[in-house]
Amino acid sequence: MAIDTFAKKDFNTIAIMGLGVTASAIMNMLSYTLKDKNINIKLLKYKDQAESFVKKYEKNEQFSFEICDTHEELIVDSDVVISTVTYTDEYLSEFKWFKKGALLLPVHVMGFGNVDYLFDKVYLDDYNHLKHLENIDRYKYSCEFYDVLSKQAKGRENDDERIISYNIGLSIHDILFANKIYELCETLSCEEIELKEPKEKYWI
């Protein structure tokens, strides 16, 4: 959804660093949501992960693949940059590597504290979960993703804006809880469930 909402028009290059389970889940999603687009996928080389990743998706003709040796090579000229690196205590980029119009999606929120405040807009899926970010008070323009979806705030306004969308995956929890509520409705044969603050663990 972040790509659909914040990527520039006619984007055609997606860069991915960190090629584990999360990256595979993203590729599966892109295979469905971008099925009418031809996309060049750039992968950061690490051990044999990039080659294995290509083999996994090479039958999908909408994707072409390019393996990059450095972070700079990966990011330069990419329209969308996705980081699924699970842990790092180092910065992963320089601001000058991001082209005009680039969208950066740091899935695990790490590695871009040296550049995020230089982007034109920074979107957060939940402020309280991300208020620890080192530059949270320095962003030029920032709001929650929801505010854009509900048209209470501006999204991308032109194809030159560099944008970051920090997502920590709260929607996954929302979907789980909604599913549990539906299950309760079926089990209890009721149309309404009283929602109140939980005092014990209902679902394990």
Language-model features: locations:
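A short acidic, amphipathic alpha-helical/loop segment
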Residues: 29, 93-97, 177
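Adenosine-phosphate binding glycine-rich loop
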Residues: 3, 115-204
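A general structural motif
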Residues: 10-11, 36-40, 101, 119, ...
